[in-house]
Amino acid sequence: MGRLDGKVIILTAAAQGIGQAAALAFAREGAKVIATDINESKLQELEKYPGIQTRVLDVTKKKQIDQFANEVERLDVLFNVAGFVHHGTVLDCEEKDWDFSMNLNVRSMYLMIKAFLPKMLAQKSGNIINMSSVASSVKGVVNRCVYSTTKAAVIGLTKSVAADFIQQGIRCNCVCPGTVDTPSLQERIQARGNPEEARNDFLKRQKTGRFATAEEIAMLCVYLASDESAYVTGNPVIIDGGWSL
């Protein structure tokens, strides 16, 4: 018996990183996983794993989300993962950067929740997990102005949904990781003028002396998706290797 046997789980940004690790972990625990991403070629790599079906989805497009929701009969868990990390202070953040970050990091979650929550309410049970970050209202982080703003908004969204629908059997939590070794992190390191220095800068802020793995984050997500966490709702769950201490 798996910890997620019989559960239908939809997640976004499943083609790589935390999303991919979570999709694989969910499937190993017996869930039926519907993995979505905008990157069709990388998403297809998941199709070889039992229990996972894939669907191309741009989470910034309301029409696509609504069409997808109409195709889904039921779901038990919605995991909103998609996001973008902008590097810089408020002075480095142009309006287009601000708008893009807000659109992908916050509005996409609003659209997904609004589309799929009615199905959960109809079945009188549901579980929503949102990807936030320690770089949010949890901790002020240098050069993460718009990113931290969006992730603080995700915490607010999470608490609001949890409070509004707790009596209808809905749970909503968010995951707040520290620095995770993902393709996204490696891209950000390589984009800096001195990648080795950039990597060391990222490592310095982790008191454990290492990055988290995507698989470590995924195992927390398995717990939040399972009935083991039935009494947990409205919480920003921190997994940061002591960064916020």
From Swiss-Prot:
GO molecular function, one term: oxidoreductase activity, acting on the CH-CH group of donors, NAD or NADP as acceptor
E.C. no: 1.1.1.-, 1.1.1.30, 1.1.1.104
Binding site for NAD(+): Q16, G17, I18, D37, D58, K151, V180, D181, T182, P183, S184
Gene Ontology annotations for the cellular component aspect, listed alphabetically: cytoplasm; cytosol; extracellular exosome
pH-activity relationship: Optimum pH is 7.5-9.0 with (R)-3-hydroxybutanoate and 6.5-7.0 with 4-oxo-L-proline.
Entry's localization field: Cytoplasm
One of the GO biological process terms: fatty acid beta-oxidation
Cell cycle is among the record's keywords: no
Keywords from the named record: Cytoplasm, Lipid metabolism, NAD, Oxidoreductase
Pathway involvement of the protein, from the record: Amino-acid metabolism; Siderophore biosynthesis
Residues that coordinate or bind substrate: R144, R188, R205
Expression triggers: Induced by low iron levels, and down-regulated by elevated iron levels.
Main location: cytoplasm
Keyword Magnesium: no
InterPro entries, per database record: NAD(P)-bd_dom_sf (IPR036291), Sc_DH/Rdtase_CS (IPR020904), SDR_fam (IPR002347), SDR_superfamily_enzyme (IPR051122)
Catalytic activity: cis-4-hydroxy-L-proline + NAD(+) = 4-oxo-L-proline + NADH + H(+); (R)-3-hydroxybutanoate + NAD(+) = acetoacetate + NADH + H(+)
Active site annotation, chain numbering: Y147 (proton acceptor)
Gene3D superfamilies from the UniProt entry: NAD(P)-binding Rossmann-like Domain
Tissue and organ distribution: Detected in liver (at protein level).
Family: Belongs to the short-chain dehydrogenases/reductases (SDR) family.
Subunit structure: Homotetramer.
Function (record text): NAD(H)-dependent dehydrogenase/reductase with a preference for cyclic substrates. Catalyzes stereoselective conversion of 4-oxo-L-proline to cis-4-hydroxy-L-proline, likely a detoxification mechanism for ketoprolines. Mediates the formation of 2,5-dihydroxybenzoate (2,5-DHBA), a siderophore that chelates free cytoplasmic iron and associates with LCN2, thereby regulating iron transport and homeostasis while protecting cells against free radical-induced oxidative stress.
Protein name: Dehydrogenase/reductase SDR family member 6
This protein's encoding gene: BDH2
